[in-house]
Amino acid sequence: MRPYLLLTPGPLTTSESVKTAMMTDWCTWDEDYNVHIVEEIRKGLVQLATRKTDEYTSILMQGSGTYCVEATLGSVITPKHKLLILSNGAYGDRMGNIAEYHEMNYDMLAFDETEQVSVEYVDDYLAHNAEITHVAVVHCETTTGILNPLKEIAHMVKMHGKKLIVDAMSSFGGVPLDVEELGIDFMISSANKCIQGVPGFGFIIARKSELQYCKGVSKSLSLDIYDQWDAMEKGHGKWRFTSPTHVVRAFKQAMDELAAEGGVEARHARYCRNHDVLVEGMRSLGFKTLLKDEVQSPVITSFLYPDKEFDFKEFYHQLKEKGFVIYPGKISQADTFRIGNIGDVFPEDFSRLIEAIKTVAK
């Protein structure tokens, strides 16, 4: 029995069957786990990411999505490289923090949190800064819910002959994309987002030809994506260090449920319906969205406080008592709160949410 729905961008509400999948113990040395679960996940992730499956591989890494972002940047960027980070929110900024810690040679182009990354500006920057070798960008910036124009960014980056690293943490599995068609070299995501698993590991979809250059680059033992991949390849799914077995098994169940739903296109359509029901209902109650509709993702939606007297903590706790957990805002330029549209939640859940907000907001 669910005490409440998590209307958050991850961790999120999971199905009962995903939770039940964690009720069995697994041996990390056994082929039932490594071959029939881990390797099936690795293969399935590549199939979700592209039709050109022979050109890409996947690496699973223990920890949160940020662990995978740091592992990727730390395994890809050498002292001979120069990284350009495109940021319009907290998660783009976090890549900058990682680059600082690793003393990488990098530049950052910062854009307003409520505006998409400007393709024209980045194009001009790359045209005048030939020393840039890699570009990193967040696809869906959950700071606000904005969806960056990945197709246009990727085309422009490839036109300039640069390598592309994409943080698709909150979009992969819920927003259609093909890494090969877009020319993405490394794409990063996490178990507890649109594929609707639980927290505990993330993953990288890597172009095989680029991954080979990562050997010996990382200065970290545990956050080395090449060594992790090499161990999984040679060990048929065996992780270098203890893997989160229950989380991995739950993720396999979540992937099966994604396929049963009809794949990424069908899930994207459900998330869009969730978002539409939410926004229509909230606007009918007088709430305003932070972002323009044309740049809004279906993943998470930011709403402005209705007035100066609005008490988010009180609003939050009253909604929680009615069975809904939402998210505080994360930007400095406006008072906002956020409601996630992803997870094992459906349009009828958002209709119930609107009814709850109608009583709470009186």
From Swiss-Prot:
The keyword Transferase applies. Keywords: Aminotransferase, Pyridoxal phosphate, Pyruvate, Transferase. Its cofactor is pyridoxal 5'-phosphate. It is an enzyme of class 2 (transferase). It catalyses: (2-aminoethyl)phosphonate + pyruvate = phosphonoacetaldehyde + L-alanine. It comes from the Bacteria. The modification N6-(pyridoxal phosphate)lysine is found at K193. GO terms for molecular function: 2-aminoethylphosphonate-pyruvate transaminase activity. Its EC number is 2.6.1.37. Pfam families: Aminotran_5. Involved in phosphonate degradation. Belongs to the class-V pyridoxal-phosphate-dependent aminotransferase family. PhnW subfamily. NCBIfam families: PhnW-AepZ (TIGR03301), PRK13479.1 (NF010006), transamin_PhnW (TIGR02326). Homodimer. This is 2-aminoethylphosphonate--pyruvate transaminase. The gene is phnW.
